Amino acid sequence: MWLLQHRAAALFLFAVSFLMPVSHAHSREKTDIKTLVIVSHPYPERSVLTKGLQAAAESLEGVTVRNLETLYGYDTRQINGDAERKMMREHSRVVFIFPTHWFNITPMMKAWLNETWGSVGPGLWQGKEMLIVSTAAGGSATYGPDGRIGVSLADVFLPMKACALHAGMAWLPPLVFEGARSDRLPSYQHQLIERLKQ
């Protein structure tokens, strides 16, 4: 019985992550701002929401998507800081898509920032924009003034805000999905596409 349930769950995850298309109503749309999307998930084989959000971003013209685990695996020493800085210079907005991982960004995303921004002085990315897009399993029972940890999910991203402001970037209000569930993926994709088109 357990094996059948496990296989059914695996088939469902496959169908949701690989077969669920982004709505045709959104295809061929474009963003007016040249956008670099950095995607990371610590367990890509289990990713449903992050893969779905990546697919939504890829459906827009004017968006360049870089999945860190696809490019570099888990070897942080392989991150090419020079190439990543070149990508940053070629875009006006950077978007980070990731699941909230222990109240933080993912390990590969942190390594990417260290390699790419490690020598960034104040104002180096002046005039560019930063947007955080994140999913979190926890909802109001975890986040917010009455939640278990007593801080909002947006507060978890204050270090990223500090990075953006230090580098001279405009900090955009994060797009965060609390209590995230795979059956809500089409809504999350739609919200992301609408934000990227702004």
Language model segments and positions:
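N-terminal beta1-alpha1-beta2 submodule of the flavodoxin-like/Rossmannoid cofactor-binding fold
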Residues: 14-122, 193-197
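Short, glycine-/small-residue-rich phosphate/pyrophosphate-handling segment
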Residues: 129-172
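Short helix-terminating capping/connector loops at secondary-structure junctions
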Residues: 124-126
